C-alpha cells in the first residue's frame, strides 16, 4: 500500500439544509469551513437536493444541488440519497469522496415522506494490486422517536451483518439521534464496531444544539481500522453555522 493511503479521514455533518439554528442561510460559509479541513470523506445529513421555492427566494442559493456545491472544489465523487420528498423538492443524505465509488445502495428507513431516514451504503477501494482494500462507508440518519429508532437500529445491524464482511474495514457516521446512548453497546458487543470519540475520550461527543451542545446524537463508528484522532468541531465558525456540530476523525489501516 502506498504511504499516502495508510490513513483515511472523515467528517460527519448534519447541515440542516444549509440553515443555522436561527434560520439564516449559511451554506457558503459551511462549504468554506469544510474546505479548510480537507478530509477524504464528508458524510452529510439533511442536505437539500432541490427546493424550488427557496432557490427563487434566497439570493445565495446555489445553482447546483447542495452536495454538488460543497463537493466541487475537492471531492470529485459524490452520492446522494433522496429520502424526503415533497412538493417543492427533496432532501436526504450524501457522501462526498476523494476516491471513486465501486458500488452503492440506499436503504430508506423513513416512515414519513418528509422525514429523511436512511442508510447510504457505499464501497471504495484503497491501494493497488495485491494491497487493494475494500472499504465500506455508511452514512446514517435515524429517527427522533424511540420506537422508530429501535426498528431502524435493528435494520442497520442486520444490514451490516449481511452486507459487510468482517475482514473488510467499515466507517459509519451520521446523525443517529441516540441521545440516550443505547446503540454503541450492541454495536460493539454483537458486531465489533466501536465509536471513534468514545474510543479516544471515554465518552461520546456532545454535538447538538451547536450553540450550546448538550446531546450526543452524532457519531463516527469504525471496524477493522485504528482511530488516531477524533474531534468535535466547536467554537467559531461551527457553532454559528448548522444546528449540529460536525465530528472529525482519522483512521489508520491495521
Model-inferred region functions:
Residues 45-58:
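Active-site neighborhood of divalent metal-dependent phosphoester/pyrophosphate hydrolases
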Residues 1-41, 62, 68-69, 73, ...:
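Active-site regions of metal-assisted phosphoester/phosphodiester hydrolases
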Amino acid at each position: 500500500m502506498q504511504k499516502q493511503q495508510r490513513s483515511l479521514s472523515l467528517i460527519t455533518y448534519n447541515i440542516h439544509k444549509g440553515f443555522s439554528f436561527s434560520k439564516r442561510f449559511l451554506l457558503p460559509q459551511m462549504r468554506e469551513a469544510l474546505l479548510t479541513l480537507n478530509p477524504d470523506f464528508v458524510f452529510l445529513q439533511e442536505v437539500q437536493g432541490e427546493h424550488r421555492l427557496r432557490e427563487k427566494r434566497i439570493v445565495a442559493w446555489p445553482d447546483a444541488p447542495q452536495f454538488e456545491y460543497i463537493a466541487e472544489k475537492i471531492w470529485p465523487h459524490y452520492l446522494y440519497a433522496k429520502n424526503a420528498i415533497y412538493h417543492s423538492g427533496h432532501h436526504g443524505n450524501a457522501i462526498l469522496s476523494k476516491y471513486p465509488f465501486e458500488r452503492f445502495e440506499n436503504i430508506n428507513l423513513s416512515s414519513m415522506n418528509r422525514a429523511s431516514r436512511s442508510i447510504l451504503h457505499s464501497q471504495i477501494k484503497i491501494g493497488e494490486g495485491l494491497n487493494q482494500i475494500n472499504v465500506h462507508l455508511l452514512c446514517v440518519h435515524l429517527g427522533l422517536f424511540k420506537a422508530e429508532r429501535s426498528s431502524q437500529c435493528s435494520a442497520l445491524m442486520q444490514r451490516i451483518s449481511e452486507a459487510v464482511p468482517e475482514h473488510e474495514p467499515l466507517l459509519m457516521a451520521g446523525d443517529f439521534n441516540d441521545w440516550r446512548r443505547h446503540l454503541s453497546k450492541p454495536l460493539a458487543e454483537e458486531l465489533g464496531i466501536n465509536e471513534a470519540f468514545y474510543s479516544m475520550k471515554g465518552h461520546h461527543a456532545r454535538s447538538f444544539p451547536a450553540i450550546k451542545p448538550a446531546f450526543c446524537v452524532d457519531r463516527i463508528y469504525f471496524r477493522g481500522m485504528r482511530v488516531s484522532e477524533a474531534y468535535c468541531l466547536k467554537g467559531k465558525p461551527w457553532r454559528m453555522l448548522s444546528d449540529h456540530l460536525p465530528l472529525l476523525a482519522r483512521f489508520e489501516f491495521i
